[in-house]
A protein has these predicted regions:
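Active-site-adjacent helical/loop segments in soluble small-molecule enzymes
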Residues: 407
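Alpha/beta enzyme core
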Residues: 102, 116, 141, 158-349, ...
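Glycine-centered helix-coil hinge/cap
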Residues: 40, 342, 383-384
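C-terminal helical cap(s) of enzyme catalytic domains, especially alpha/beta-barrels
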Residues: 60, 192, 329-337, 380-400
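Glycine-rich active-site/cofactor-binding loop and its immediate structural neighborhood
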Residues: 91-130
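A gly/proline- and charged-residue-enriched helix-loop-helix capping module
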Residues: 120-160
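Short, conserved beta-strand segments within well-ordered enzyme catalytic domains
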Residues: 68, 83-85, 94-98, 124-126, ...
Length: 424
């Protein structure tokens, strides 16, 4: 990736001279607008929306505005290096494709498309626990590419154990445990539309492909509860058809089966556990030798507790503002956590990155790498795998150019001296 900046930039301009426009817009606002125009109202609200009045999401992007890059001149920056080392492996850039669920609402290629996009750039793809396609099929579609797996801690420890084992057997190189979704945040955009994709059978492929979950479904059918049978209307019919279409197997067999609806009911019951404590982490630590990263850390003391309880890495994140409204911007939490950890484990960052300059700022503040989510989802919506790859390539190109324009040749040179804090 030594010249990804100039190569990408030149390729776009050469294409323009021949009448070929870019597949995806380079500007964030235009990219979001293009995705909105492509996606259904329900789908766009789910992807773009955040918690409450979306003040945390606003804080995430505003936090970057408090920093300015201080360029240095007359340095030889002809050769630049974006590589980073994480958990014993070298990666060509500091960018990781963050876990995002229910990708089928963005594009039919869903997780397979995103896995191909990440693999084309050597970027680790973190498969979501709420994927539209099983982790086995997703990982098998890009053999040799770096794959990680994100875990939501279910109320069933047996299911948690099964998911971890499946990820390890499928070739995952790390387990990312998301801590901030032990309850679903209050999301007005979704609430106003009365839309939760999981209730329609979307985004539960990791579950319907899991033997433990399938057993729970079978047991539920064999011992039915007193669940209310909804009165049939057009909305109920659409929901039942959604469940049927998205459940594994033949549509016509599923239409006659109780399994699709029961699977949704079981998922909604076992999805998360609000009683988790630090002591629960030992359960996962005993069941895998893979690096374990804890995602959702925002306080230095929690970062310390994460290390004390065996975490191999920390992801400073607030879920892109989707969980708790009026929380601090994730970037505002980064420096104190980096100082607290003092290089004992890698500290990764996400929430609010929209540009290559944002990535550079996060790295200069001490992040070992960054995770990017919404930007590539919008690219996927606009252009499938090629669109997602183009968005990621644009981010890397801007990072590469800005690394050189700031007078640096490698990620390791970035630090406090690279930035100036804008007090206003």
């Amino acid at each position: 990736m030594a010249s990804i900046g100039r190569d990408t930039q030149s390729g776009i301009y050469r294409g323009g001279a021949l009448g070929k426009m870019p597949l995806v817009p380079a500007s964030w606002d235009a990219l979001e607008a293009a995705a909105r125009a492509t996606m259904s109202a329900d789908a766009f609200a789910y992807v773009a929306g955040s918690a409450g009045r979306e003040r945390t999401a606003d804080a995430n992007t505003a936090a970057f505005d408090a920093w300015r890059i201080v360029p240095r001149m007359l340095r030889d920056v002809g050769v630049r290096d974006l590589t980073v080392d994480l958990f014993g492996r070298s990666y060509p850039s500091p960018v990781i494709a963050a876990p995002v669920g229910v990708l089928e609402v963005a594009h039919p290629e869903a997780d397979l498309g995103m896995a191909r996009a990440a693999a084309a750039l050597g970027i680790p793809y973190v498969a979501s626990n709420q994927a539209s396609i099983s982790l086995e099929d997703t990982f098998a579609s890009t053999p040799g590419a770096p794959h990680w797996f994100q875990l939501y801690w279910s109320s069933s420890d047996e299911l948690v154990e099964s998911l971890i084992a499946r990820a390890e057997n499928a070739g995952a190189e790390a387990i990312v445990i998301t801590l901030d979704t032990h309850m679903l945040g209050w999301r007005p955009r979704d609430l106003d539309l009365a839309y939760l994709p999981f209730a329609h059978g979307l985004g539960i492929a990791q579950y319907t492909s899991d033997p433990v979950f399938c057993r729970l479904v079978t047991e539920r059918i064999a011992a039915p509860t007193q669940s209310e049978t909804p009165r049939m209307n057009s909305a109920v019919l659409r929901t039942l058809l959604d469940m049927t279409r998205h459940y594994p197997g033949s549509f016509w067999s599923n239409l006659r089966s109780k399994e699709p609806r029961t699977a949704v009911e079981v998922f909604l019951e076992v999805f998360s556990r609000s009683s988790l404590t630090w002591q629960n982490l030992e359960f996962v630590r005993k069941r895998t030798k893979l690096p374990i990263l804890l995602k959702g850390i925002q306080h230095p003391d929690d970062a310390e507790l994460a290390v004390e309880h065996g975490a191999d890495g920390i992801i400073v994140s607030n879920h892109g503002g989707r969980q708790l409204d009026r929380a601090i911007g994730s970037l505002d939490a980064l420096r104190a956590i980096v100082e607290k950890i003092n290089s004992r484990v890698p500290v990764l960052f996400d929430s609010g990155i929209r540009s290559g300059s944002d990535i550079l700022i996060a790295l200069a503040l001490g992040a070992s790498a960054v995770l990017v989510g919404r930007p590539w989802v919008y690219g996927l919506a606009v252009g499938g795998a090629a669109g997602a790859e183009a968005v990621l390539r644009n981010l890397l190109a801007e990072l590469d150019l800005n690394l050189g324009l700031s007078g640096n040749t490698s990620i390791t040179e970035l630090g406090a001296a690279t930035l100036s804090h804008n007090a206003s």
